[in-house]
Amino acid sequence: MDNSIFYSLGNGIKFNKNKYKKEIGIFNGITSHELDKQTKTNNKVHFFKNTTPSTPVISKKDNIKQKKEEEEDNDNDNEESKEDDDFVEDDDNDDDDDDDDEDEENEEPKEKEFIKHQVNNDEEEEDITLFNKSNENENSDDSDDSDDSGKNKNKNKNKKVSKETQEDKHKREIATFRNKHRIKVDGTDIPDPMTEFSQLENRFKVRKYLLNNINEIGYKEPSPIQMQVIPILLKEREVVAIAPTGSGKTASFSIPILQALYEPKKEGFRSVIIAPTRELAQQIYRNFRLLSKGKPFRICVLSKNLHNQSTNENLIKNYDILITTPLRLVYLIKENLLSLNKVEYLVFDEADKLFDKNFQEQVDIVVTACQNPKLKICLFSATMNQQVEELGHSIMKNPIKIIIGEQNAAAITVDQKLIYVGKEEGKLLAVRQLIQKGLEPPILIFTQSKERAHDLFQELIFDGINVDVIHSERTQFQRDTIVKKFRMGKIWVLICTELMARGMDFKGVNFVINFDFPHTLASYIHRIGRTGRAGRPGVAYTLYTDADTPMLPTIVHAMKQSGSHVPDWMLNLKVQGKKKQQYRLKGVERESFSTIPLSERTSSKFKLRKNKKSFNLPGDQQKSNENNNNNNNNNNDNKKRKSFNNNGEKNNNPERKQKQIKKPKKII
């Protein structure tokens, strides 16, 4: 009997076959003596005789032939087994009686009938298997066709299973890669991240000049934000990206924009990048210049000179990329001096600041001015609250949200430390002690106001330190020269306000000192983010007094979240919600820390400008004209009053001083 009855148990299983072969041999009439000889040679045999795991498909004709051959073999085996049995019985029972021989002769035909009947049953059992269909066609050709169709179905199933397993495996690999780099994504149809810049050429067909510029700048491996944002923008999707300071957000949108614009065209602005400060706009401009080297893209930063030249339409059409602050752009839009109908990419850098209450109206004007149906809006920032996200989603189409690390968290590369100074007078002493310890410049010091920045400047300038101060009241020429000197190392310590807290990339800054405690968590994160950029380590010191306790728990939890050491008692501090809200809105009225007399504090070189120049928007022109007319009327009234003496008599020269010149006496 064939051993096909065991084929359904599984592939490649090894077992002791003696137990099963004895039972089969008994039914086939094989003696136990012959079975023992066979089992000595092969105690353990592979489950299948054939090495191939797949069983051949046999048609009905082949089955009939095999059955006939098996019947003949079984008959021969039965005859041989009978002869063996007779020979054994004769040897063993030589002393038996003749009656026993007669009984054996009578029993032989019965055994033959039993064996034949058993073989026929085995042949019937061989026709039935566990995997055969119950209903079979009568024609052998039909059965062969059905077998072929079954094979094809199994192959298709295997292919589907293999495809599904490959897709699942790919998804698992992408998920582990994102978890490794702390990339969190939210959206639909999210492209896979890239692992190397070399994939830009094969996967996205990025132009060679861009790849060469990336190598020349020194970008070896993409940062986590670049790994995910660049593929998304190259697939022409909108994005909301939240990543720590110094993580490479500018390059993540500069590379896809240059690839999408392809080449310079004289069609007007096709990409607009909006930044909250002019210093940040200048920095983005430099980044675009480095990446666009080799292609004559016309990139400009909106300035007063361009304001004056904006009436020339041909000049504006020559530009491809515009980088600006929102106020200047809104002025040109309201004056109908600028068209944004060709804009394909609108990027808001430091979006949480631009979507603040002070900028919301300006942002709405810019968005409504961009009428291109292919417009794609992108938001980038290190911090972003829920309100800003909702405003962003209201003007975007199915954006993808990306978070690197934890949302609204400080950079891991910055070692954050708190220093208690008691009162305001202790801050100046703490700064001098830190500098004496050997803090390596360049150093950034943040204050909450321009006046306090001036006072600190005048205190440190007499300590023999190359120090300077920058804020919004300085002229544009002064601000540009100060930033340039600070980058070149001519200025060691730069005192600044919130103007320099956002987006500025000073690669060599080793230390940041928060002279005044920040009012919000976002301000704290952006301040300390001026150090520890691009993977380099940095240190941030924050000075605090008793008046800063309402905001202290928030900063402490941010430090703990980013891995900095914080005492346990600070984590257990509890502050009333009203005090915290008042601190955020009103701040703290701080006492003066200066040791210089009040009359000698202000310097003529850094004197604050009283008449601040600003751009009058078209809607504000009537108010300004009315104010000017009122001022002119008041001046005329004053002139009329001065033209009369106290006695009511007219003065011939009212503008001169009313000193009467004595005429010389006539000599007779």
UniProtKB/Swiss-Prot annotation:
Helicase C-terminal domain mapped to chain residues: 413-574
Name of this protein: Probable ATP-dependent RNA helicase ddx52
Disordered as annotated region, ranges: 37-174, 601-668
One GO MF term: ATP hydrolysis activity
Gene Ontology terms: cellular component: nucleolus
Leading EC class: hydrolase
Classification via InterPro entries: DDX52/Rok1_DEADc, DEAD/DEAH_box_helicase_dom, DEAD_box_RNA_helicase, Helicase_ATP-bd, Helicase_C-like, P-loop_NTPase, RNA-helicase_DEAD-box_CS
Motif segment (Q motif): 199-227
Source species of the chain: Dictyostelium discoideum (Social amoeba)
Localization terms from the record: Nucleus, Nucleolus
EC numbers, comma separated: 3.6.4.13
Composition-biased stretches (Acidic residues): 70-108, 138-147
Keywords noted in UniProt: ATP-binding, Helicase, Hydrolase, Nucleotide-binding, Nucleus, Ribosome biogenesis, RNA-binding, rRNA processing
